[in-house]
């Protein structure tokens, strides 16, 4: 039976004019801002460098879509909000995307991209992480005095029978438990893990690898490791002490800690009774868990509010005022939570629906690489602007999703962007900044 697809649509009259619509406009794209993503990529040389080092098991005589094209097609698609491989069966003919990845013919289909993702392995994951660190080092003109490495894990909900799927009691769902490492807003690690392990599993090894490479580049640099109480494990603490790495890591409260902190807890309670306002009192105690090799300094934050007592503890090997260390250094790790939220919410890091383990690790890395492009666009192109602190989804909506008519011939490709775009001046500023240097 013949199925007819409607190509023209009628809408209610406006100002005595008939309104008609149809998908017959030719080369028109909603992704005119792809040029900014491409420019950020060229600035970093991200995909060009990765493509030179990533393995490609395909027969070179039969390759239609080069590895760098596949990488760009997937990353640029994620930046523009296309998380599903099926989207590329339509996008492969989009002139805007073709231009961004520097191809004139149809791009790879969803099945080609799927085969590519399922061919990923441990070596590919290692090379991407290595590329992140090398790029991070290369982007520093001068050696930094201090680097703060933030560790955190998050849940990646699962709805199928993926390899490594386990039920997690805390999150109350089947999920993966990826580990992220950030230095400021720069992503240095995105490591997929099953959820049937300790939240700190592999953290020590990853920190050791990062510290070793960073100190090769900058021997005098001071390195600080931050994490919540899930990462307070003797192996990590002992390694940091032995290698002159500073740390501020949350410590779960217990009866011994509460007993040691009792003077400050009572002081906060007394002050609250007198003022009826939230009180915080800070102190430092020496504490050693049974599994630790020695006692360590622990910051006590004795807080009392209208809801009662709320003591918190942070183990440190730094000197300084307890309140300053807690407020100015430890609490600053909360900004990392926003960066982690951007991974699934803005760049679809939770799209780990492949059956194979390494294919899902590869998807997590692709989202991380897309974040690297968006972070560069924000850090370089949007510094000091109204979008300087905007999340990836906001940047996409206001600067990347711009309607454009495309005219392509043998000499040039013209993007005729929407004249009514409200961010034209900002767009021009970003172009100039990404083109400089």
Task: Identify what each model region corresponds to.
Residues 1-173, 177-198, 202-217, 378, ...:
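Dynamic "connector" segments at or just before major functional cores
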Residues 146-150, 222-224, 246-248:
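Structural preference for beta-strand elements that scaffold enzyme active sites
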Residues 71, 350-426:
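Basic, amphipathic alpha-helical segments enriched in Lys/Arg and hydrophobic/aromatic residues
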Residues 3-23, 246-348, 404, 430-437:
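An anionic, glycine-rich sequence signature occurring as long contiguous blocks
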Residues 237-246:
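Short, surface-exposed basic-aromatic patches at helix termini and helix-loop junctions that form
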Residues 40, 88, 325-362, 366-377:
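Short amphipathic alpha-helical "interface-anchor" segments enriched in bulky aromatics
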Residues 152, 220-231:
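Acidic/histidine-rich, metal-coordinating catalytic segments
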């Amino acid at each position: 039976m013949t199925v007819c697809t409607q190509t023209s649509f009628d809408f209610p009259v406006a100002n005595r004019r008939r309104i008609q619509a149809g998908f017959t406009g030719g080369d028109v794209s909603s992704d005119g801002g792809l040029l900014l993503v491409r420019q950020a990529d060229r600035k970093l040389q991200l995909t060009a460098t990765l493509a030179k080092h990533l393995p490609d098991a395909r027969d070179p005589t039969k390759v239609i879509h080069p590895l760098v094209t596949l990488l760009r097609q997937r990353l640029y698609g994620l930046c523009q909000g296309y998380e599903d491989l099926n989207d590329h069966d339509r996008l492969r003919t989009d002139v805007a995307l073709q231009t961004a990845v520097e191809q004139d013919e149809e791009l790879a289909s969803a099945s080609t991209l799927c085969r590519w993702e399922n061919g990923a392995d441990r070596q590919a994951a290692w090379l991407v992480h290595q590329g992140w660190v090398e790029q991070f080092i290369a982007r520093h003109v001068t050696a930094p005095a201090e680097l703060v490495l933030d560790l955190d894990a998050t849940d990646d909900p699962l709805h199928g029978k993926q390899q490594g799927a386990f039920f997690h009691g805390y999150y109350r769902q089947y999920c993966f438990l990826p580990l992220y490492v950030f230095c400021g807003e720069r992503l240095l690690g995105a490591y997929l893990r099953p959820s049937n392990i300790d939240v700190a599993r592999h953290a020590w090894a990853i920190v050791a690898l990062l510290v070793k490479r960073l100190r090769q580049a900058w021997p005098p640099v001071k390195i600080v490791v931050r994490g919540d109480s899930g990462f307070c494990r003797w192996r990590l603490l002992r390694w940091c002490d032995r290698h002159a790495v500073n740390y501020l890591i949350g410590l779960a409260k217990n009866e011994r800690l509460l007993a040691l902190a009792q003077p400050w807890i009572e002081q906060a309670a007394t002050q609250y009774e007198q003022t009826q306002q939230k009180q915080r009192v800070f102190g430092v105690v020496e504490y050693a868990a049974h599994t630790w090799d020695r006692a360590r300094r622990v910051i006590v934050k004795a807080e009392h509010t209208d809801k009662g007592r709320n003591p918190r503890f942070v183990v440190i090997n730094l000197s300084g005022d307890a309140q300053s260390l807690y407020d100015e250094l430890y609490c600053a790790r909360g900004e990392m939570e926003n960066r982690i939220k951007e991974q699934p919410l803005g760049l679809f890091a939770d799209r780990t629906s492949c059956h194979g383990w390494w294919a899902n690790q590869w998807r997590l890395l692709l989202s991380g690489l897309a974040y690297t492009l968006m972070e560069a666009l924000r850090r370089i192109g949007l510094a000091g602007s109204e979008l300087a602190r905007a999340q990836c989804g906001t940047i996409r909506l206001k600067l990347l999703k711009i309607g454009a008519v495309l005219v392509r011939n043998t000499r040039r490709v013209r993007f005729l962007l929407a004249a009514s775009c409200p961010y034209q001046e900002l767009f021009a500023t970003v172009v100039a900044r990404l083109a400089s240097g």
